[in-house]
Amino acid sequence: MALRPEKPVWMSQEQYDRQYGKLEEPKPPREESKPGDQAKPSAEPKSGSEEKTEGSSSSTGQGEERPHFKIQKRRHQNYDLEERKKKQQLNKLREEQLKQHDIEMAANKVVNVDQIVREHYNERTFHAKRYNRNYSPIIKLRNFNNAIKYMLIDKYTRPRDVVLELGCGKGGDLRKYGACEISQFIGIDISNESIREAQRRYLNMRDLDYQVILITGDCFGESLGVAVQPFPECRFPCDVVSTQFCLHYAFETEEKARRAILNVSKSLKVGGFFFGTIPDAEFIRYKLNKFSKEVERPSWGNSIYKVVFANNSYQLNDYEFETPYGNMYTYWLEDAIDNVPEYVIPFETLRNLCDEYGMELEMQKPFNKFFVEEIPQWMNKFSPRLREGLQRSDGKYGVEGDEKEAASYFYTVFAFRKVKDYVENAPAHA
């Protein structure tokens, strides 16, 4: 016999019956036949359906039928589903609160941002395996970013080059380098899950004919020698060093930024190129200049992305950054980045560091300008699928709507050429 739980006080009887089924009224017990009753006319015969229903009822064995309930399983399952959704939402809220706590700790220099970044990209790698990229709400933005990287990589990479990519992620650029016919690719990333996924992708790319070495390691916080020492097959110095959408993590401190650029310089041949994609500090300043000094945490964005600064120190310092390093904001990008701490890269600071470590500026342009200048010669090189993915609603190529600000305006491309080896100051002799 199915039992119904006790009705909560906040639930109406109608809701309760709808959720757990309505209790049928029990039928009166059959009266035993008596000798004097035999003369009474018999009742009308039951219909076949009524007989079937009665026959299916369970009996107590004493002539009394048990009551039974119409349990509405589908509604009960819906109730369980709602409960699971509530628990998932609660767990997600707790995770976001913990993450926000970590971000605040990073802003106050209590914890290193590397841990937050590593955990984020490990988690994103896990979720990325479970859905089709083509259904992403930012598929146009992803196509645009891929086109930018195709053009940038092709511009500075030559056949038989040895390539080092710092922050290689899940290996999304392996095919781009394959088109350049390089001889070796060395990819390093702080996320062990991203490296594992990059290895899986590489094994499925049977048409790549160059050597691929994938390493888990810290590209910015320590010497690259620590990460690459177990891999003697790496052919240093390299012809190309690339950093795509990750160098901003190095500008947490001056020490970290210097270590990152020193790693680049030491890994690169004289005449080789260092190129990449970074947030455009001028666009960020343009946005920050719109806020008054009373706004404690300046923020802006749209349905695709959002930027939130940890404080209003820029405004309070007469609309200038107090220091080139440690200017933190959290960045959210739909279906890609979940409020991860990033740091402003004042481009003149990057240029000065590169100059100090033996590299001269070759090119720096916002995404939109670089795309407009390079796209005419690329339309016949892109695959039909990518060309279709770049087409806007007006028939032109690029990004539009909310995606335009998040991609075309927020980022810039750069390239430096190494002109001399950096020689560290030798210790003074007594």
Curated annotation (Swiss-Prot):
Record-listed mRNA binding positions: N145, N146
Region of interest called Disordered, as start-end residue ranges on this chain: 1-88
Top-level taxon of the source organism: Eukaryota
Biological process (GO), any one: 7-methylguanosine mRNA capping
Sample GO molecular function, one term: RNA binding
Residue(s) at site: mRNA cap binding: K170, K176, R201, H248, E342, Y411
Record-annotated membrane-spanning stretches: none
Keywords: Methyltransferase, mRNA capping, mRNA processing, Nucleus, RNA-binding, S-adenosyl-L-methionine, Transferase
EC number: 2.1.1.56
Primary location group: nucleus
PROSITE patterns documented for this protein: RNA_CAP0_MT
Purpose of the protein: Responsible for methylating the 5'-cap structure of mRNAs.
Family membership noted in the UniProt record: Belongs to the class I-like SAM-binding methyltransferase superfamily. mRNA cap 0 methyltransferase family.
PANTHER family: MRNA CAP GUANINE-N7 METHYLTRANSFERASE (PTHR12189:SF2), MRNA GUANINE-7- METHYLTRANSFERASE (PTHR12189)
Protein name: mRNA cap guanine-N(7) methyltransferase
Gene label: ABD1
